[in-house]
Amino acid sequence: MTTQALQDHILFQTGYLVNGIWKTLDTTFDVLNPATGEVIARVAKAGKAETEDAIAAAAKAFPAWRAKTAKERSAILYRWYELIIENKSWLGRLMTTEQGKPLKEAEGEVEYAASFIQWFAEEAKRANGEIIPPIKPGSRILATREPVGVVAAITPWNFPMAMLTRKLGPALAAGCTGVIKPANNTPLSAFALLTLAKQAGVPDGVLNAVAGNTHEISDAIMASREVRKISFTGSTAVGKTLVRNAADTMKKVSMELGGNAPYIVFEDADIDAAVKGAIANKFRNAGQVCVSVNRFYIQETVYDKFVNKLADAVTALKVGNGLEEGVVVGPLIEPSAVNKVREHVEDAVARSATVLAGGKPHPLGGNFWMPTVLGDCHEGMKLAEEETFGPVAACFRFTSEDEVIQRANNTPYGLAAYFYTQNLSRVFRVSQAIESGMIGINECAVSTELGPFGGVKESGLGREGSVLGLEEYLEVKTLHIGGL
């Protein structure tokens, strides 16, 4: 499918969405294919005025949407889920074109995104309240759950569809309306899903979207008293700023922020399984994943065996345009991402790390970087302290369980962690000791619509997905009834 064929599709939108209408602006910004540098769209560059219009539309639509029965909202959500699945092939190609990940991964993300809509279509019917024992005769105490109101969802470029539905699924299920601010690198994926939402029966004004002038959009959202909740996925630095600004109007906040995930391979681990898990986790989306491993800790007695197998496997990974057959590692999102990877690798090598695979820009040039394995890494290197967000596996040695737990926890972040062992006692000891919101034990994937997703320490606030996800979009109202 050519870029022109994508552009001619009804789901290809380049405006901003207010009250069910896609509007254009004279001022635009370019959306690029990270694999080729080609301009694939010029998108309306919204700012303060457009954002305020979007907020007003969401506020106006809120009373009617919250008044719908849970069953009615559930039916609309389920139809949205069906439409996403029906359009999986086209949506996957759109995502690969604007984001860069291999087509198979992109189609997998479409399914993953749809799973949140399907899940919350069911959870919409379970926003249950409570009857509390009365304190005196002739009285009742009831606790009800009600939608928080207008929600602002600010989503990242690395999972442009899944991060949208993980927020909008529970928001719509709860009875909230929303303003969506997708990342400027990847607005087209979000806009396509919102177009399908309207086809599914989401009323005009319930979902609105703006992209463009990030500071103006953010400032308008944070200043608004109509917006009662912010859900943000992105960097810890930006998240902290949003939390501070939210305090002025006491908005509820959900924050899914940065990580520095450890991956611990104990000497009793299944080494082949650990290598397979490492490849799947670290090099998915070219390492541009918030729960991607940042630090591999391998016990001294199995260190050489693990890193040699890992380096061999990494060398065999095919790099290229995600639309090409057999490609498993696509480009980084933009030149600044390449520069950060280069900076981390060069710093590590200067501090005595050994390049076991890759370690330099890919011959394809542009935003491509060779999948890399670095050995003999240690604390003090930039890649030990900062999230690399690229296809670099940094390997550290350790000797004892107590030592590696201390080193794994020696970070302000706590989003995800992983460890491989066949010792059941160690499973419980280490999982309790690791300071992380999610832990993979002999498992490289920690994200599903069924499980709570979120971090501790400076990696976030709140949980997304699961039965807990709906709670983030509800307020509790207590009714004290007398004279019965």
Residue ranges and their predicted role:
Residues 1-34:
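Hydrophobic face of amphipathic alpha-helices that form TPR/SEL1-like repeat modules
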Residues 37, 73, 95, 117, ...:
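Residue-level signal for inorganic ion chemistry
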Residues 38-127:
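Glycine-rich loop-to-alpha-helix module at the N-terminal edge of alpha/beta enzyme cores
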Residues 40-46, 61-67, 153, 263-266, ...:
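Short, well-ordered beta-strand elements within core beta-sheets of diverse protein domains
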Residues 60-63, 67, 82-89, 100, ...:
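Generic secondary-structure signature for well-ordered alpha-helical cores
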Residues 129-273, 398:
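Rossmann-like NAD(P) dinucleotide-binding subdomain of oxidoreductase/dehydrogenase enzymes
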Residues 237-378, 441, 483:
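ALDH superfamily catalytic-core signature
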